[in-house]
């Protein structure tokens, strides 16, 4: 979705806004990726958020870093006061799309607004499942193995330790006696650096990227008319990104904090649709059917009929067969001749 913003910004001629979002996106997306790695490290390589929960108390530095990244990617901010990085760059793109005055620009504006809602929902879903709620760690096979190994050998699990004295008491709260630890400083320092960019990069650089033609020094086409139109869009356009962000946040909070039974109930009502999206539109299955299986079939045909049936048969295997057959005949004649010679000498 973030790359989509950059493309349709360039499509309406807002090249500065596209580059600005590329710039801010580098901070918060890298921050979220590295933050996810820190969480996976703490959870003994478990990557399924359904087996996380309540981690903010155990890995607080990672939590605050990922919170900064989430606030940036969802575009949290107060108009005219301060906002995180994505607040400035994403809003600039939506304003440019609306201000372009074209039908495609209007379509891009509404599609971008809907994408912002989805981004907000899945980003806050990630945060709520990972850092809030009750621990669901013991449901993870990775955590079960870590607990079993630590209990059996008495050593520390990767990124955590096992509390054997309270293991039985902990099973009821979903931890299984597993205690995640914060990542080492070598992983936390990059999170801190990227957090600064996720928080301040938009506020510091938005005028340079959007309003300052001298900043680009002719590197991109600068449309002053479009920039002027961006500043003149209605207030509701400027507030659209914030409103859809709040809607996405509210839906995620309702489903994953307020009433955690909502996702399961929803899946029961739309099971075919859920399976379609859960299986990634069955893209892997279609790709396997259309490309992989035919490629393997052709490969087997070339191997069986071409390589084995022709090349090997009339090549090395055929020559070998001829030599072996000739050798067997010669060997038989020599053996027969030696037998007659031996018999004659005996006589």
Predicted features along the sequence, with ranges:
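Alpha-helical transmembrane segments of polytopic integral membrane proteins
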Residues: 33-36, 45, 81, 90-91, ...
């Amino acid at each position: 979705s973030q790359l989509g913003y950059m493309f349709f910004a360039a499509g309406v001629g807002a090249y500065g806004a596209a580059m600005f979002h590329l710039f801010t996106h580098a901070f918060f997306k890298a921050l979220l990726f590295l933050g996810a790695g820190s969480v996976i490290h703490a959870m003994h390589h478990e990557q399924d958020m359904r087996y996380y929960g309540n981690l903010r108390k155990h890995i607080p530095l990672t939590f605050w870093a990922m919170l900064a990244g989430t606030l940036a990617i969802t575009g949290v901010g107060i108009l005219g006061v301060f906002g995180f990085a994505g607040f400035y760059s994403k809003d600039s793109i939506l304003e440019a799309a609306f201000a372009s005055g074209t039908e495609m620009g209007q379509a891009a504006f509404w599609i971008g607004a809907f994408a912002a809602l989805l981004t907000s929902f899945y980003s806050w879903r990630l945060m709520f499942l990972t850092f809030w709620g009750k621990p669901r760690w013991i449901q993870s096979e990775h955590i079960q193995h870590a607990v079993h190994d630590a209990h059996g050998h008495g050593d520390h699990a990767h990124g955590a330790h096992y509390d054997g004295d309270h293991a039985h008491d902990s099973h009821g709260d979903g931890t299984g006696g597993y205690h995640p630890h914060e990542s080492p400083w070598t992983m936390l320092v990059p999170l801190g650096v990227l957090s600064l960019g996720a928080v301040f990069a938009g506020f510091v650089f938005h005028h340079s990227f959007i309003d300052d033609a001298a900043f680009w020094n002719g590197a991109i086409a600068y449309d002053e008319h479009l920039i002027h139109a961006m500043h003149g869009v209605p207030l509701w356009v400027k507030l659209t990104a914030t409103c859809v962000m709040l809607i996405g946040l509210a839906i995620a909070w309702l489903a994953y904090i307020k009433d955690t039974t909502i996702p399961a109930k929803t899946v029961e009502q739309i099971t075919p649709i859920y399976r379609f999206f859960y299986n990634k539109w069955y893209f892997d299955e279609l790709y396997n059917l259309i490309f992989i299986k035919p490629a393997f079939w052709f490969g087997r045909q070339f191997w069986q009929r071409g390589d084995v049936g022709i090349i090997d048969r009339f090549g090395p295997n055929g020559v070998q067969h001829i030599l072996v057959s000739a050798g067997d005949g010669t060997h038989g004649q020599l053996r027969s001749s030696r037998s007659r010679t031996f018999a004659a000498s005996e006589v």
